[in-house]
Amino acid sequence: MEATRFTFNTATLCSAQHCNCHKLTTKASGMPVQPPVWRPWIVTERDILRRNAIRERRSKPYARPSSTSNGSTRGPEPGPTSFQHPVKLHWSKPVYDYMYQYGKQLLDAFPVQATICIVDEDPAQSDDSDFESDYEDDSDTDYKPLKRNAPILN
């Protein structure tokens, strides 16, 4: 009985497209050589670079993503669900006066750290007649109490 050599194609076994395990390298003598087997207890330069990148990202959680050499950015793509820190909520003075009591509840309910910034409106554009009717005249306090109940934010 003749001995047959059992061989298999490692390229068909490897499902990852970026994997190089099925590619053969050649020595100077021309003999094909398999790349070394990965062993988790042996630290390579690639492992060190990956570990340093993770540490850097964790040490600066609010840093904006940096550009890579090919122009792409790492991290979440800016969109309607992602925030870029610091987050500022821009309120006009009348809105701030109206929502003064509920500002803390709003910031507690907001999913990220935020700051309320008061924006000065152009007097020609602002329509304060609606807001003036909602306030009582109380000149000894900094904020004006409300006449009507504002909605409660959960």
Swiss-Prot record:
This is Protein ripply. GO terms for biological process: embryonic pattern specification; negative regulation of transcription by RNA polymerase II; somitogenesis. Residues 85-119 are annotated as: Ripply homology domain. It holds the Pfam family Ripply. It is found in: Nucleus. In the late gastrula stage, expression appears in the dorsal presomitic mesoderm and in the first three pairs of nascent somites. Expressed strongly in forming somites and then expression is rapidly down-regulated except in the first somite pair where expression is maintained for a longer period. Also expressed in the presumptive notochord and in the tail bud at the 48 hour larval stage. Expression disappears by the 72 hour stage. Keywords: Developmental protein, Nucleus. Transmembrane segments: none annotated. The keyword Nucleus applies. The ripply homology domain is required for transcriptional repression. Residues 54-86, 121-154 are annotated as: Disordered. One of its GO terms (cellular component) is nucleus. It comes from Branchiostoma belcheri (Amphioxus). Belongs to the ripply family. May play a role in somitogenesis. Residues 121-140 have a biased composition (Acidic residues). A motif (WRPW motif) lies at residues 38-41. The gene is RIPPLY. PANTHER family: PROTEIN RIPPLY-LIKE. The keyword Nucleus applies. InterPro entries: Ripply_fam (IPR028127).
